[in-house]
Amino acid sequence: MDLANHGLILLQQLNAQREFGFLCDCTVAIGDVYFKAHKSVLASFSNYFKMLFVHQTSECVRLKPTDIQPDIFSYLLHLMYTGKMAPQLIDPVRLEQGIKFLHAYPLIQEASLASQGAFSHPDQVFPLASSLYGIQIADHQLRQATKIASAPEKLGRDPRPQTSRISQEQVPEASQLSQLTSNLAQVNRTNMTPSDPLQTSLSPELVSTPVPPPPPGEETNLEASSSDEQPASLTIAHVKPSIMKRNGSFPKYYACHLCGRRFTLRSSLREHLQIHTGVPFTSSQQGESRVPLTLCSNAADLGKDAMEVPEAGMISDSELQHISDSPIIDGQQQSETPPPSDIADIDNLEQADQEREVKRRKYECTICGRKFIQKSHWREHMYIHTGKPFKCSTCDKSFCRANQAARHVCLNQSIDTYTMVDKQTLELCTFEEGSQMDNMLVQTNKPYKCNLCDKTFSTPNEVVKHSCQNQNSDVFALDEGRSILLGSGDSEVTEPDHPVLASIKKEQETVLLD
């Protein structure tokens, strides 16, 4: 069972989200105009965006106004979200070019039918309607748009549009010269035909809508006030209330005035300047780069120029992807990656970590030199060298802890079964009384017997605390004296039992005699 108007409700909700910028995961920038949209909707109608989002994860897509104009993209975006033609007159030629650029094949048939039925003069450029749909426009763009409408004579004398530094860096010198000569030729034609200087001096790419000239009195006043400013590349006079100002989420680029490389960090730009000057880069203790006094003026001018944000000539998506993958943009966002002067030495960090780890590991094995953080870990490691201190008298199985020996049950266990405790090992490993729960587990029916004097005790702590005063203690003292003799170097006593030590000592004596 199909629900009525389900698709219409979905389109209305998506369009409302787009106009308010809610849940929009993509921003399309065309010059100074920014469109909020959803990637899924754009990819559904445009193969261009579909392939772009496959290979690019950026949330901002920058397009050139020469590829598709903002009014055309707004018209197509409204058609994608609503399925209806906007109440807006659009040039069919530019509309067809925009559809071909976006590869929006599902919209070709609808746009062609609308253009054939609604437009009888395809060569005429119609004005924009009262609104563009879901866009953002910079504040200076609106101010310059009102001034260009009232200063046609100023525009005729200086027809060069204001372009961003990114587009100027990518265009070769030959293309810039050819564009300059074409603009000069257009200026000459406007001087010869003064009837309509605004429409004939600029190409349709620079001015999308003709604006009627103001009265002569107002023209002179506005011309004097805007003598130091250049005209904008797009004239958009009406926006919707949902349009917001440009925020600081878009990255700023710091461009080198010598080679054109761009950086997102000013410190990276300062380091790059040393390549051109040949002066080695040095950093102070505060982590800030020091530049020679001869470069202060250039660096100051460069910093002012670099603060300008790309405006009219935005790069396309393919060029943006190429720039993001290439090493041209060396710096990253300051919140993600600090400048090189703020990054500490890796060797010093590793050395500090090692010293900190040594302070933490204060329990050291006297035999192999390993260090441990907890005393219990060190004690269990010592049992590797000395042997486990608790042993079952029936099955001769050894245990590290007393509670393990207490829980142990043998198949051949009898009433006479006991746990043999190695007193030497416990004294060497500084056996300590455990928690109350461990003591409850240790107190079992099996007694604990000392391996030196064969005395029986109820807990292993009593075995450690008692003193052996019989023959076995004397034997233990003799064994300790023998170990001391092994270390002192008496070769006559230790030679039959330790031939390896005797041979080493003989070699040392021969070396001393030679």
From Swiss-Prot:
Chain segments carrying region Disordered: 149-231
GO cellular component terms, A-Z: nucleoplasm
Pfam families given in the database record: BTB, zf-C2H2
ZnF segments: C2H2-type: 254-276, 363-385, 390-410, 448-468
Domain of life: Eukaryota
Covalent link location (Glycyl lysine isopeptide (Lys-Gly) (interchain with G-Cter in SUMO2)): K147, K154, K362, K465, K505, K506
Domain BTB per the UniProt entry, residue ranges: 24-89
Keywords linked to the UniProt accession: DNA-binding, Isopeptide bond, Metal-binding, Nucleus, Phosphoprotein, Repeat, Transcription, Transcription regulation, Ubl conjugation, Zinc, Zinc-finger
Matching SMART domains: BTB, ZnF_C2H2
Gene3D superfamilies in UniProt: Classic Zinc Finger, Potassium Channel Kv1.1, Chain A
Subcellular location: Nucleus
Compositional bias per record (Polar residues), positions renumbered to this chain: 161-200, 222-231
SUPFAM superfamilies on file: beta-beta-alpha zinc fingers, POZ domain
Protein name, UniProt field: Zinc finger and BTB domain-containing protein 2
Species this protein is from: Homo sapiens (Human)
